[in-house]
């Protein structure tokens, strides 16, 4: 390194790259017969920063992306059963985020990978929403859940479809880059089906009209989102969000779809030689396994929307055994949650196997799936939880079959109090 000011007989040194003298730069670093100035070093650092990060970043992201097996294993911790749906979701989500990695380092002449949005079909309480929530939590991406029944066409009372993107932005503190890689779950998508499978000649602002509005959003468009929400109006600033890389998962119970599938798969026969099958022979789960895009169109979804959700996963009706597992096995199982609540009062909770089966049977009778389990358990413990804070020496609360079926109060086990001498 040379000083800027030398003695009168000292030779002036120059940068071997830009040609500036030692007096024109702050520092000059000397090598074997070569000199480089601080400005050229800064320029080299900028070039390296511009060229290297994409490839190294892609390698780092790829290693952090969980495999389909890891995604499914994580789903197993929270969602009981639904093996085919979990495998389908795991592959679809893995491919989606792998596609995003590919886009970051792809060249113009590379194969362009299209987005595959997902449609979940299953009875109420079968785990559609929980699957989407668990996926987003595992991948650490912004997640928002929207209700399709609240959406209307632009210009009508209700929510615009852009409000979905606004909620996604709000979930990540308006970080546009993060929001553009998030997951949107649209629930009750079956409730916006058009009223008949013929094109509508009248305005259907909460059915076919909403489906049309969702088309471009799901496929990928530059959405103009009002930062404060509400309706758009002139002279307003908008946040531009590209929805191309947002993964849309739509879900619905599709009540009545089984009739459409039956009409297609079971041709009615006439005459003595005809085979007539009872529709009661097949469960809802078996019927849903045979769903085709044409059935969804017949049900009331417009063909364009069905085409934009190529990944189709059906969820099975939950059996009594599955509901018992849901009560006890997942990480955030209901029994564990209520045990934790009572432990805060210094009391243990015991729910006997017969009571677990009774809860499952009651939920099946209500046809609410896993969603009905909490209300049944809450109802059986509500009076006990009300009294516990004012009751001393309770050691354990025991719930048996009679508590569920006959609404009898749970059994309270008291601690032995040492008698005073």
From Swiss-Prot:
Gene3D superfamilies from the xrefs? 1.10.8.60, ClpX chaperone, C4-type zinc finger domain, P-loop containing nucleotide triphosphate hydrolases
Q: Which GO terms describe its cellular component?
A: HslUV protease complex
**Any Pfam family hit:** AAA_2
Q: Which GO terms describe its biological process?
A: cell division; proteolysis involved in protein catabolic process
**Record domain ClpX-type ZB: where:** 3-56
Give the top-rank taxon of the lineage listed in the UniProt record for this protein: Bacteria
Cross-referenced InterPro entries: AAA+_ATPase (IPR003593), ATP-dep_Clp_protease_ClpX (IPR050052), ATPase_AAA_core (IPR003959), Clp_ATPase_C (IPR019489), Clp_protease_ATP-bd_su_ClpX (IPR004487), ClpX_bact (IPR046425), P-loop_NTPase (IPR027417), Znf_CppX_C4 (IPR010603)
Could you tell me which PROSITE patterns the record lists for this protein?
CLPX_ZB (PS51902)
One GO MF term on file is: zinc ion binding
Residue positions binding Zn(2+):
15, 18, 37, 40
Keyword Nucleotide-binding recorded: yes
What are the alphabetically sorted keywords of the record? ATP-binding, Chaperone, Metal-binding, Nucleotide-binding, Zinc
Q: Where does ATP bind?
A: 123-130
Q: What does this protein do?
A: ATP-dependent specificity component of the Clp protease. It directs the protease to specific substrates. Can perform chaperone functions in the absence of ClpP.
Family, as annotated = Belongs to the ClpX chaperone family.
SUBUNIT field: Component of the ClpX-ClpP complex. Forms a hexameric ring that, in the presence of ATP, binds to fourteen ClpP subunits assembled into a disk-like structure with a central cavity, resembling the structure of eukaryotic proteasomes.
**PANTHER family reported in the protein's UniProt record:** ATP-DEPENDENT CLP PROTEASE ATP-BINDING SUBUNIT CLPX-LIKE, MITOCHONDRIAL, ATP-DEPENDENT CLP PROTEASE ATP-BINDING SUBUNIT CLPX-LIKE, MITOCHONDRIAL-RELATED
Name of the protein in question? ATP-dependent Clp protease ATP-binding subunit ClpX
């Amino acid at each position: 390194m040379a000083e800027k000011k030398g003695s009168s007989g000292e030779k002036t040194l120059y940068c071997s790259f830009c040609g500036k003298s030692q007096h024109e730069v702050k520092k000059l670093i000397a090598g074997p017969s070569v000199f480089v100035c601080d400005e050229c070093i800064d320029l080299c650092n900028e070039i390296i920063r511009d060229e290297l990060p994409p490839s190294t970043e892609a390698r780092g992201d790829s290693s952090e992306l969980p495999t389909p097996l890891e995604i499914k294993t994580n789903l197993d911790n929270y969602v009981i059963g639904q093996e085919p749906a979990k495998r389908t979701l795991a592959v679809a989500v893995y491919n989606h985020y792998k596609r995003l990695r590919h886009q970051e380092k792809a060249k113009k002449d590379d194969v362009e990978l299209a987005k595959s949005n997902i449609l979940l079909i299953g009875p109420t309480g079968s785990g559609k929403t929980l699957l989407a929530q668990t996926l987003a939590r595992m991948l650490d991406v912004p997640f928002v859940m929207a209700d399709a029944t609240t959406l209307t066409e632009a210009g009508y009372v209700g929510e615009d479809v852009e409000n979905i993107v606004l909620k996604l932005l709000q979930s990540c503190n308006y970080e546009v880059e993060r929001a553009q890689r998030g997951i949107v779950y649209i629930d009750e998508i079956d409730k916006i089906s058009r009223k008949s499978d013929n094109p509508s000649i009248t305005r259907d602002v909460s059915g076919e009209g909403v489906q049309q509005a969702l088309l471009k959003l799901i496929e990928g468009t530059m959405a103009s989102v009002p930062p404060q929400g509400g309706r758009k109006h002139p002279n307003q600033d908008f946040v531009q969000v590209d929805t191309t890389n947002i993964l849309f998962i739509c879900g619905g119970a599709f009540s009545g779809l089984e009739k459409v599938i039956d009409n297609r798969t079971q041709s009615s026969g006439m005459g003595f030689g005809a085979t007539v099958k009872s529709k009661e022979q097949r469960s809802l789960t078996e019927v849903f396994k045979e769903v085709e895009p044409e059935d969804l169109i017949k049900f009331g979804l417009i063909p364009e929307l069905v085409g934009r959700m190529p990944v189709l996963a059906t969820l099975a009706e939950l059996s009594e055994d599955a509901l018992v597992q849901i009560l006890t096995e997942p990480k955030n199982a209901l029994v564990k949650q209520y045990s934790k609540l009572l432990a805060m009062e210094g009391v243990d909770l015991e729910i006997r196997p017969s009571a677990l089966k009774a809860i499952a049977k009651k939920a099946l009778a209500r046809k609410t799936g896993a969603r009905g389990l909490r209300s049944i358990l809450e109802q059986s413990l509500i009076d006990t939880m009300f009294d516990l804070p004012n009751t001393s020496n309770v050691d354990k609360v025991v719930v048996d079959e009679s508590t569920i079926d006959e609404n009898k109060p749970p059994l309270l086990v008291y601690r032995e109090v040492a008698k005073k001498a």
